[in-house]
Amino acid sequence: MYLREDDVHLADVRCGSTTRGWSPLRPAPVFGLVLVRDGVLRGRSDGVEHVLDAASVFVERLGSEQQFAHPLGPDTFTEIVLSEPRVADLLGGDPTVPEGLVMVTPELALAHRLLLSRARRDADGFELAERTALFAAAVFARLAPDRVASGRPASAAARRRLADDARAVLAARPTVGLEALSRVVGASPHHLSRVFTAVTGSTLCAHRDRLRLARVLDRLNEGERDLAGLARELGYTDQSHMTRAVRRAVGMPPGRLRTLLTSGGA
């Protein structure tokens, strides 16, 4: 399990079943997206059969009667589980999921692998929550584009205000999570992420990382030596996480930066 929040889960699942026949009929316990990466699944949902492979995303509706079979044996898939409020956020306020298959475009395939790549490395909960919400929105946009588009703020001024409010909160509270940020500004995480990117040209995560980098540089310029404490203060997972982020941004670790800055760049 890479991400477990109230409204969204992200997991890498390996199903070791060797049963080729159908599983017992049961109601789907969650709203979810199933993205097969290796193998083939056959699914029945309310009597309709689907083939799930690496070129498709299966959109699972809570309560639908389901069965699955594994014709090639064990398979591996990514699962994104969404709460009913989060599904409603993604679908213009209506939590009714248009169940079925979405064919994977090259853009979706790449976004899926980038999401997993970040999850397996040093992405924190804020980044994963934003990436997962944006990915789920991209899937739903192919299944129900009008409903996904219906939640957009009505005017450019409203979009700008929302982005500005988010920037103000992030500047004051660098450790705030995506869910908390969304509550403060009065928008769903998905709509906030989408509007912020449209207005600023940057994701919320990238903007937050720039703010954190600026604070790191200022503190190093002041000679800060407690790097572990600085990492905790700014919301990094640990000192190693901060070191990787700083090195990725400016090409050198915090210790070398401190030496450079306190020596006047000589």
Describe these PLM feature segments:
Residues S155-A166, T200, D209-R212:
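N-terminal positioning helix adjacent to the helix-turn-helix/winged-helix DNA-binding module
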Residues M1-E5, G255-A266:
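Actinobacteria-biased recognition of intrinsically disordered, low-complexity terminal regions
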Residues L178-A214, A231-L260:
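Basic/polar phosphate-binding segments, predominantly the helix-turn-helix DNA-binding elements
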Residues G93-R152, A166:
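Amphipathic alpha-helical segments enriched in hydrophobic/aromatic residues interleaved with Lys/Arg
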Residues M1-V97:
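N-terminal regulatory/effector-sensing and dimerization cores
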Residues L217-G229, E233, T237, S263-A266:
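Intrinsically disordered, low-complexity basic tails/linkers immediately adjacent to helix-turn-helix/homeobox/MYB/SANT
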Residues L115-A123, A138-R147, D165-G177, F196-T200, ...:
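Basic, amphipathic alpha-helical hairpins
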Residues A11, V34-L35, F58-E60, T78-V87, ...:
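Hydrophobic alpha-helical membrane segments, chiefly transmembrane helices and signal peptide h-regions
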